[in-house]
């Protein structure tokens, strides 16, 4: 099938076959995928984000399930965001950490943390065997304009501290997109997932980017609840982005 992309060309969309849902074990899923061979893909990606799509490797996709519409694209309106009490505590708890934005180029230290995270979060699921090739394919891709937000413990004697988290982030003219975040399992008390989003918001604000895309939110799914705790959250209904009230709860 095809949708109109501009006044001259059509952008082709492909529909995948059904596959196991990554969120509900008793459901099947399928996706719409932008033509991965379209040479305009990098240029079209910012608009695709605004249409509710997301990047995984070189693929730009959106859930398109036959009997389920649970996956809702969400983003934060950066200038309107203000951290709540729980998020302020998260920032205070992590004020000793060193945060920097680096090139999206894999290091052995990042790969080791990625594998540690997957082995802890997804044991036996296939992802826990990922190596360097899968890291590059899944997180970096061939055409995206991405950066890594690194979070580290403080340096000691001018030696960089231990790497605690990496937030893979796509950069477009008007927005950032949170692609994937992985962090040290033994640092769970720091709520590094929430801290990474708070730092991405600050990054977007510094560079005058209007939105931070958070991917998909699923109402009632425990692993997705943290996204509702951010105020200035907007959801895409297939035609328009509309504001959502923030839910209350502790930072993950």
From Swiss-Prot:
<keyword id="KW-0963">Cytoplasm</keyword>
<keyword id="KW-0808">Transferase</keyword>
<keyword id="KW-0012">Acyltransferase</keyword>
<dbReference type="Pfam" id="PF04377">
    <property type="entry name" value="ATE_C"/>
</dbReference>
<dbReference type="InterPro" id="IPR016181">
    <property type="entry name" value="Acyl_CoA_acyltransferase"/>
</dbReference>
<dbReference type="GO" id="GO:0010498">
    <property type="term" value="P:proteasomal protein catabolic process"/>
</dbReference>
<dbReference type="InterPro" id="IPR030700">
    <property type="entry name" value="N-end_Aminoacyl_Trfase"/>
</dbReference>
<protein>
    <recommendedName>
        <fullName>Aspartate/glutamate leucyltransferase</fullName>
        <ecNumber>2.3.2.29</ecNumber>
    </recommendedName>
</protein>
<dbReference type="InterPro" id="IPR017138">
    <property type="entry name" value="Asp_Glu_LeuTrfase"/>
</dbReference>
<comment type="similarity">
    <text>Belongs to the R-transferase family. Bpt subfamily.</text>
</comment>
<comment type="function">
    <text>Functions in the N-end rule pathway of protein degradation where it conjugates Leu from its aminoacyl-tRNA to the N-termini of proteins containing an N-terminal aspartate or glutamate.</text>
</comment>
<dbReference type="InterPro" id="IPR007471">
    <property type="entry name" value="N-end_Aminoacyl_Trfase_N"/>
</dbReference>
<dbReference type="GO" id="GO:0071596">
    <property type="term" value="P:ubiquitin-dependent protein catabolic process via the N-end rule pathway"/>
</dbReference>
<dbReference type="GO" id="GO:0008914">
    <property type="term" value="F:leucyl-tRNA--protein transferase activity"/>
</dbReference>
<dbReference type="GO" id="GO:0005737">
    <property type="term" value="C:cytoplasm"/>
</dbReference>
<dbReference type="GO" id="GO:0004057">
    <property type="term" value="F:arginyl-tRNA--protein transferase activity"/>
</dbReference>
<dbReference type="Pfam" id="PF04376">
    <property type="entry name" value="ATE_N"/>
</dbReference>
<dbReference type="InterPro" id="IPR007472">
    <property type="entry name" value="N-end_Aminoacyl_Trfase_C"/>
</dbReference>
